[in-house]
Amino acid sequence: MKAEPIMRNSNIVGFDMKSLSFSASFDQTQGSPNGIDPRLACILSKYAGQSNKTNFLGLFELSNNKVSSKLYSEIIWYFLDGVDKRIIESNFDDAQTFNKYIVQTSGRDIIFYKSKISEKWWMLIDTSKNKSSSYLPCLESDYLDALNDNIPIRWLKATKRV
């Protein structure tokens, strides 16, 4: 899912329950005709829980009815389930834990890391200004794009911010 790396890179995650679809909100005064469905909210919540960075989950604009309360409980349960299944992956130089891929695209090298444990992907973002590096969560599709000489949008946005 394309949202997974975004959730994996978030410190704070908030869900506005008015973003749920009418059918999911169980309250015609809440919700949106094109809102997200409860399954997606639970999946996103689990991704947030699995993130090593996420330290806050907030649910906002709550409806006061029994069915909605059950949904909020499920969203929180999925977050806690994700926290329970967190894998601390931070030593990217450990060849026992990560595969390192260097891809040449349009005259620049992009370095990717893939966890041998979780099979999740990261890109190295080199910040030459302060001589430090950060690791940006990404998808295998970003790696495949780079192999086809297409610089991943995620990498471009991250390096533009640096």
Residue ranges, per PLM feature:
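Catalytic cores of soluble, metal-dependent hydrolases
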Residues: 1-162
